[in-house]
């Protein structure tokens, strides 16, 4: 299977665009680390059906990301945040509480 972390992130971004069953299976497989057999048993279906569903959903999530580019936008925001924080840390005159406050607010912007 593909990079588990990458798919897990795509589930976080686009999971609401999947059906309830697709979302549940993808979450069980990528976030809860259940095996195909365990998921098949829970869903009362075959291991092959779960495997096919996971492959289909992975392609679907990648397709959403190619079109909407949320992961690239978030990555870019984190890079900008790190650059800003590096510049702030160069200035030793700033109070640590102010730096922490700015860091928290930048995090809110990224996650908005």
Curated annotation (Swiss-Prot):
Gene3D superfamilies: Winged helix-like DNA-binding domain superfamily/Winged helix DNA-binding domain
Database matches in InterPro entries: RNA_pol_sigma_r3/r4-like, UPF0122, UPF0122_fam_protein, WH-like_DNA-bd_sf
HAMAP family associated with the record: UPF0122
Job description of the protein: Might take part in the signal recognition particle (SRP) pathway. This is inferred from the conservation of its genetic proximity to ftsY/ffh. May be a regulatory protein.
Record family assignment: Belongs to the UPF0122 family.
Name under which the protein is recorded: UPF0122 protein CPE1714
Species lineage: Bacteria, Bacillati, Bacillota, Clostridia, Eubacteriales
């Amino acid at each position: 299977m593909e990079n588990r972390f990458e798919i897990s992130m795509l589930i976080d971004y686009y999971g609401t665009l999947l059906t309830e069953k697709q979302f549940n299976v993808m979450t069980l497989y990528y976030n809860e680390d259940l095996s195909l057999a365990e998921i098949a048993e829970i869903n009362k279906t075959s291991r092959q059906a779960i495997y096919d569903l996971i492959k289909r959903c992975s392609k679907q999530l990648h397709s959403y990301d190619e079109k909407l580019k949320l992961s690239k936008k978030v990555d870019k925001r984190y890079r900008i945040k790190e650059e800003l924080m590096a510049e702030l840390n160069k200035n030793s005159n700033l109070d640590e509480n102010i730096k922490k406050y700015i860091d928290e607010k930048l995090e809110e912007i990224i996650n908005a």
